[in-house]
């Protein structure tokens, strides 16, 4: 079990997802921005490993406009050495990595143009992880998508479109249950048709479910992760007090997290904390998890001095 948080470290004072307006696009602007983003990503990973935080979700904005037609720049070639160095660090310290495209990435859209944009966006995510030299345990997660007035047809369209995705994408894609439209049961049905692994979101399940116990859900989803996929990833959060249903808590509820950890023994999985204060909650969660025999991590880290390639 590894503990992680998504995209942003609020402590170290940099952002790995800096971007700019489309009208400002130019290769020099892209190079400058991406160089800064990659430097920040390295700093975040160092910080995390030193504190035994060995799961991290990389921001989708790492390479701005990478999937947009305006971007014809060979970012993989230009940043080959730095991407490889980051990948070497990730591998040497056994850090688990994921990415999560935004809610506008919809492969089951009724609009073919939206599907095509989504296909390119998913491919970009897979290419980032490939450029780092990471194996299939590094995943790209997404929601099933919209209902578009007919849930049965929309589920079928997801299955059909999944087969049209690039091989690089299918190699890394996982789907998660959401809190409004597609329950865990729906995601498991898609897995039966496609083989795509299912990531269990415990908070979403607490809102949209069919009465299934969390332990059973983790067993079912674990069975969808095969061979080189690694152990399952799980998203964890809880409801923010006084906010609309589905609002993520600003800081971890330690008692709730401790109960979650206790209830799920001995099942093993990596936990992504979708909580607003990011690394602060991750450190609190790691302090709880270190008492558990499933928790893994090692302190101390240095980046390779030379390009491993």
Say what each PLM segment does.
Residues 148-156:
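Loop-centered beta-sheet repeat module
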Residues 182-183, 203-207:
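Short acidic, Gly/Ser-rich segments with clustered Asp/Glu that frequently serve as metal-coordination loops
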Residues 140-145:
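Short, charge-patterned binding micro-sites
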Residues 103, 179, 204:
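Short, glycine/acidic-enriched loop or turn micro-motifs at the edges of active sites
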Residues 152, 175-181:
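Domain-core and long-helix interface of multi-subunit machines
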Residues 100, 201:
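Conserved acidic functional residues
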Residues 1-96, 103-119, 123-134, 138-139, ...:
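Alpha/beta catalytic barrel-like cores
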């Amino acid at each position: 079990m590894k503990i992680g948080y998504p995209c942003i470290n609020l402590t170290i004072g940099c952002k790995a997802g800096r971007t700019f307006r489309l009208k400002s696009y130019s290769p020099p602007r892209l190079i400058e921005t991406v160089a800064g983003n990659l430097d920040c990503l390295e700093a975040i990973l160092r910080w995390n490993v030193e504190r035994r935080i060995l799961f991290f979700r990389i921001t989708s904005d790492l390479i701005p406009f990478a999937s947009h037609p305006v971007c014809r720049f060979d970012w993989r070639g230009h940043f080959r050495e730095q991407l490889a160095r980051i990948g070497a660090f990730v591998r040497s310290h056994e850090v688990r990595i994921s990415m999560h495209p935004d809610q506008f990435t919809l492969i089951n859209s009724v609009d073919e143009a939206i599907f095509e944009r989504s296909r390119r966006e998913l491919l970009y995510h897979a290419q980032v992880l490939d450029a780092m030299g990471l194996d299939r345990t590094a995943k790209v997660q997404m929601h099933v998508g919209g209902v578009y007035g007919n849930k049965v047809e929309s589920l079928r369209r997801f299955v059909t479109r999944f087969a049209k995705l690039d091989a690089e994408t299918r190699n890394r894609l996982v789907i998660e249950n959401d809190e409004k439209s597609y329950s865990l049961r729906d995601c498991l049905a898609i897995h039966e048709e496609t083989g795509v692994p299912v990531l269990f979101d415990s908070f979403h399940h607490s809102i949209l479910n069919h009465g299934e116990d969390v332990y059973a859900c983790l067993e079912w989803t674990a069975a969808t992760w095969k061979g080189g996929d690694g152990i399952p990833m799980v998203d964890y959060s809880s409801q923010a007090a006084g906010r609309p249903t589905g609002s993520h808590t600003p800081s971890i509820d330690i008692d709730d997290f401790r109960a979650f950890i206790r209830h799920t023994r001995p099942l093993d999985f990596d936990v992504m904390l979708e909580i607003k204060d990011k690394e602060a909650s991750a450190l609190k969660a790691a302090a709880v998890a270190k008492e558990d025999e499933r928790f893994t991590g090692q302190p101390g880290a240095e980046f390779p001095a030379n390009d491993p390639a």
